[in-house]
Design a protein with these regions (language model features):
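N-terminal intrinsically disordered, cationic/polar leader segments
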Residues: 2-140
């Protein structure tokens, strides 16, 4: 199964991330985001960041997760290439704990692709068939 694929949206880019589990699909969504910004195959897993978020449903959880990744990228000036996600469900909704690994951006070494301005809710979806599919669009 492919990890993710992109689709065209006017002035934006969308992606569908896949996984056998919800966690794996979220990890692949993180990889998809950072492959829009740079080629993650050249990003070393030197620095570790962890965060936890809670959201009322799976779609809101996906949005909040992607927003947090973008926030850490912008504030810490980092690229990430390794994602470990744990998701739990309760009566209040969903909780996500993520450990992500990457390194400080070095544009002399890292390929600069596109700048992500924002994560959007437009067409965002979490779907379970024989596997999980997460769909999101980012504003470039």
């Amino acid at each position: 199964m492919k990890r993710f694929e992109y689709f065209d949206v006017t002035a934006d880019i969308g992606f569908t991330a896949y996984g056998n589990t919800l966690e794996e699909a979220f990890e692949n969504a993180g990889l998809a985001i950072f492959n829009i910004i740079s080629d993650t195959s050249g990003v070393n897993s030197k620095i570790v960041r962890s965060f936890e978020i809670s959201s009322p449903d799976e779609v809101a959880l996906l949005y909040d997760y992607l927003e947090e990744l973008l926030f850490l990228h912008e504030v810490d000036f980092m690229l990430f290439s390794d994602f470990d996600v744990d998701i739990s469900r309760s009566d209040d909704g969903y909780s996500l704990m993520a450990t992500i690994k990457g390194e400080a951006i070095d544009w002399d070494r890292h390929e600069r692709k596109s700048e992500i301005k924002a994560i959007t809710f437009h067409m965002m979806d979490v779907k379970k068939t024989e596997h999980y599919e997460l769909r999101a669009i980012v504003d470039l």
